[in-house]
């Protein structure tokens, strides 16, 4: 599949160009003291997506050692200090985590085995900004096996598993990330990945668009050598489309978020399992009979609603799109406006990708002990900033769980400060992440090896053939056997026997 230099051709006209405008406002970050005299790197940066995506299962919490990693002098066993992690001594534990993840990521391991002899990414210098977990480590090491040099930072302040970052640093990957970064730390880590003497990236792998945004703001000349951008999240994709619409996108970009393998597997199945895991670990709540409102009925919302319904919850849905709204109704959920149920629900979950979905007015009207959380990428969906006022008291009851108390004694339970719930408070299924990570790897290979002129300065969707290939790599895990078309059947349908089997407009 990867042996030919001729790669997949993406239909440049198939991208979804609908724009969702986000206000250019700075997000709320975890407030942590930084060393006096440090120059803030973040003052000119807006619209950050440093939402929470950390694991409750992490070997160490960020509070274990209050000394900032930036103030430590650390070296790995090879003598390299080109990294900044919480504690390099955690590398052995992190290596075990990575080895466990490899067992549930069959497609990436198969891709590593099939393509490492060819080295399709030889000469690639990839700078990445994603969630640094064991699954990401498997992706990074696969990219390295395929010939790429990588430098990596975390795409949000809570996502990093410290032991995994240490294991990557011990293996020689320049990683700049730790759990519980401050705002200044976040941008400093990204800058350390990008601003390196004698090393300049030629590929970007982003999740949320912050890395791309930083390079545009601080080092625009770097785009002269960058061949392309691969973006995973809805937030980052919207930012790319906005750049393209304004005529400011100067390199080709691949939209992984809207690929079939991301939308229908990562967004749906991942959230269907991890929403319950995150809520259980943080609240110990029984879901049977509880009233829940889910804001948004996209693939993430569908997964959340299905999981909660199966547990016996009474689920309401809010939605702006009449098509998604009709789907919710026919799936057995009651469609409401948030104001209609806000006084009675026990749990509020946002998954829209928009801003101020839950406002201070909504928060004021919630019942006592209502649980409020977000499982969309951005941390803008819940107006957490409006809760940071003198009349309200914040009480940290456990990691990633805050009680916000009103003067009359009413309290709400806010999870992960309104940031991404599932890996802030739990984990996500490794097998599902294998699907997304394989898609990212193939997108990087495609853009890096594409002949000049194949891709213009625009945002492209993955080709159907690539989606089908990713899916096929995961089928052996289930001992699944695909039916093959006969020549007569293929001719009747007008298809190639080897695919693609669906047109680009097909909705799975």
Curated annotation (Swiss-Prot):
This protein's record includes keyword Endoplasmic reticulum: yes
EC numbers, comma separated: 3.13.2.1
Enzyme class: hydrolase
Highest taxon of the lineage: Eukaryota
Biased composition (Low complexity): 42-61
Protein location: Cytoplasm; Microsome
Cross-referenced Pfam families: AdoHcyase, AdoHcyase_NAD
Cofactor note as given: Binds 1 NAD(+) per subunit.
Biased composition (Basic residues): 32-41
Descriptive protein name: Putative adenosylhomocysteinase 3
Gene: AHCYL2
